[in-house]
């Protein structure tokens, strides 16, 4: 849509160049002597143009580059014709009307429009200029703006001194059959930039002429109303507009679209996708997210590829799209499976979008906590979207069962099951990780077995992220440490059995089988890292099982709760489609009237159909929560329907997406009339 509108404006700019070509193509009128010089150069003879009929800056023909033709050019003065071979340029001068026919128009070329203009005429000296678009051939010659599309009419009187910039206020007129659509415009003297362009209505199909032949999005019918373009942005209302998107059709669309510097946004659209109710909300940014948008790469990207995949689902009942931030889109699908209805929520992440980053959050900022809702963590940390995280000790300590990296720091050590790690380039690794580290004291070395785990096993490192208090734990001893110079050197400040709660400081806890003894004042060395190492890791979270590996269902041998494999209930996962695209996907469950849920194999199959090459589940069941910033909101909110009496569960941690881009400026709400439902066409 942006590319088509740009071409329309470029065309209008070329027409205004023609109008202003009466005096101002290169920002200043060419003096009569220059015209004479060009004519002499072309004809090889003197030309008398002294008559006032040809002067006054009302018109000249310098833009036709008469003197540039290799073949002779003939001029019959005073009311005859300028003709030239090569470009087949001719000018017929017959007062009071000047008619110019152009096979190749350098005025259009000057405006950056490689088109062939059939003819225009200007009533002399101060009347309308009419451009008769008998045929405008676009690059390649396979697309044209034919006479059936109408006539542009430009009215205005851009007379100005030759040493100042002129502006043009006038009206373009598009005729489509018997209907006439005026377009008010203001242009600079060189015709290359519009200050404004307004139209009460334009047929959407008129834009198809300016669409490249291989474009995936093609306007078919309907109207654009209240078009208002200013400089690089504008808005318009869709009124029953139909687009063909690849092999699919979006039709009966209503709503407001917003054009801005390469992106098209919408506060609200409603219509049908292949007969399925479709709606979209929010503002789309420079990277298109909604399936019917045209992208300069001529590929459907982000949610668009998702749209094409989902549209092929025979059980699809409805589609909803909106956008959260540049590079981040939200989609929701209502589907019908053989087991009952399904509600699928999807966050699509453009891994190449520089304003997006991943991180994790932990309940109340501590490993041991009272739990916190995913949405509350998102609001507290100013996230724009996210999902719940790892399995956890529900109702007690709320500590996550698996690993956690927050802000590049290892906060909770891994266990013997899957986790995912995300680096600063938003590359994701699904694997089983371990903690590799040692505590060295008095010439002895002890392997670290865990980080911020309680009660402590053999040797566990405790950091301030653990919580405010170390609970009592029989048989566990805690040695508090303070820096002793150097990155990994510490001094023991106290050693105490964990027979009663005590304040948390950095230190080492060891169980009865650790066979380690530390004394106050002793110097120790503490080192630990993830194994395998992931350079530049910024976020990591535990979960599992791995559901998809190399594009196929994967039976994870270390799946948590293996007896839940065939439960049909809420499930959620992070999936990698490519190095450029990630998906967070949630399937609601335990709502027979809305969504019955999916088994792990069923969910893996859905992820594969969405394009996943690799995917890992997170904590499922009642914990499944997806949040994002809805259009018009400043903070995140729950977008799916959790299964705990439709209420959000308190959890241990969450995986979030953050954006440094400014919050979108929303266009005014559309007055949209949703078309009545209609049956899906037979396959």
Q: For each predicted feature, which ranges?
A:
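Generic short beta-strand segments
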Residues: 62-66, 94-98, 132-137, 169-171, ...
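Strand-loop-strand
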Residues: 167-172, 254, 260-276, 281-304, ...
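Terminal hydrophobic membrane-targeting helix
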Residues: 20-102
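Broad, structure-driven detector of short, well-ordered beta-strand segments within folded domains
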Residues: 75, 80-82, 150-152, 183-189, ...
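Hydrophobic membrane-insertion alpha-helices, especially the h-region
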Residues: 9-24
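Hydrophobic residues on conserved beta-strands that form the core of alpha/beta folds
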Residues: 47-49, 61, 75-77, 88, ...
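Elongated, acidic membrane-bridging lipid-handling scaffolds
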Residues: 73, 77-78, 84, 111-206
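Gly/Ser/Thr/Pro-rich low-complexity, intrinsically disordered segments
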Residues: 301-683
């Amino acid at each position: 849509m942006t590319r088509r509108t740009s071409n329309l404006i470029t065309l209008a700019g070329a027409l205004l160049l023609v109008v202003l070509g009466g005096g101002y193509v290169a920002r200043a009128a060419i003096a009569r002597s220059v015209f004479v010089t060009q004519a002499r150069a072309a004809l090889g003879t003197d030309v008398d143009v002294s008559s006032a009929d040809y002067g006054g800056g009302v018109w000249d023909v310098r833009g036709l580059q008469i003197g540039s033709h290799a073949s002779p050019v003939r001029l019959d003065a005073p009311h005859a014709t300028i003709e030239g071979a090569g470009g087949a340029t001719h000018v017929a001068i017959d007062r009071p009307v000047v008619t110019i026919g152009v096979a190749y128009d350098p005025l259009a070329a000057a405006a950056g429009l490689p088109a062939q203009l059939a003819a225009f005429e200007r009533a002399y000296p101060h009347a309308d200029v009419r451009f008769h678009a008998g045929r405008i051939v676009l690059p390649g010659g396979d697309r044209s703006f034919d006479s059936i599309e109408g006539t542009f009419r430009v009215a205005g009187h851009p007379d100005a001194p030759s040493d100042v910039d002129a502006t043009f206020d006038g009206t373009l007129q598009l005729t489509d059959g018997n209907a006439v659509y005026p377009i008010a415009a203001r242009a600079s003297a060189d015709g290359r930039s519009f200050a404004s362009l307004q139209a009460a209505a334009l047929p959407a199909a008129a834009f198809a002429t300016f669409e490249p032949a291989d474009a995936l999005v093609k306007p078919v019918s309907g109207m654009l109303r209240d078009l208002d373009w200013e400089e690089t942005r504008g808005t318009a209302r869709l009124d029953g507009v139909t687009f063909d998107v690849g092999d699919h059709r979006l039709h009966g669309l209503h709503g407001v679209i917003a054009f801005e510097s390469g992106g098209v946004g919408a506060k609200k659209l409603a219509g049908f996708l292949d007969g399925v109710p479709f709606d979209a909300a929010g503002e789309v940014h420079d990277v298109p997210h909604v399936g019917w948008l045209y992208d300069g790469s001529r590929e459907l990207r982000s949610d668009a590829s998702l749209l094409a995949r989902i549209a092929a689902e025979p059980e699809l009942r409805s589609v909803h799209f909106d956008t959260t931030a540049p590079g981040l889109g939200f989609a929701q699908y209502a589907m019908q499976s053989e087991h009952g209805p399904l509600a699928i929520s999807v966050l699509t992440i453009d891994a190449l979008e520089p304003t997006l980053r991943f991180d994790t959050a932990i309940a109340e900022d501590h490993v041991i906590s009272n739990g916190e809702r995913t949405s509350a963590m998102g609001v507290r940390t100013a996230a724009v979207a996210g999902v719940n995280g790892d399995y956890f000790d529900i109702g007690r300590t709320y500590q996550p069962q698996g690993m956690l990296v927050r802000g590049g720091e290892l906060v909770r050590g891994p266990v013997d099951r899957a986790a995912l790690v995300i680096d600063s380039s938003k590359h994701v690794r699904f694997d089983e990780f371990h903690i590799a580290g040692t505590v060295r004291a008095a010439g002895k070395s002890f392997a670290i077995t865990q980080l911020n785990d309680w009660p402590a096993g053999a040797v566990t490192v405790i950091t301030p992220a653990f919580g405010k208090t170390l609970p009592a734990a029989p048989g566990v001893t805690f040695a508090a440490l303070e820096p002793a110079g150097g990155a990994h050197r510490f001094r023991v400040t106290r050693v105490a059995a964990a027979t009663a709660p005590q304040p948390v400081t950095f230190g080492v806890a060891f169980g009865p089988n650790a066979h380690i003894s530390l004394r106050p004042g002793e110097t120790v060395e503490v080192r630990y890292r993830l194994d395998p190492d992931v350079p530049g890791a910024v976020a990591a979270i535990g979960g599992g099982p791995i559901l998809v590996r190399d594009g196929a269902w994967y039976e994870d041998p270390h799946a948590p709760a293996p007896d839940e494999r065939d439960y049909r209930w809420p499930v959620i996962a992070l999936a990698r489609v490519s190095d450029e695209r990630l998906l967070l996907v949630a399937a609601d469950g335990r709502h027979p009237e809305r969504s019955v849920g999916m088994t792990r194999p069923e969910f893996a199959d859905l992820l594969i159909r969405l394009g996943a090459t690799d995917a890992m589940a997170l904590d499922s069941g009642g914990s499944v929560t997806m949040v994002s910033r809805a259009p018009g909101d400043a903070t995140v909110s729950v977008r799916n329907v959790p299964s705990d009496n439709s209420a959000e569960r308190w959890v241990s941690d969450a995986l979030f997406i953050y954006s440094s881009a400014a919050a979108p400026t929303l266009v005014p709400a559309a007055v949209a009339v949703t078309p009545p439902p209609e049956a899906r066409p037979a396959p």
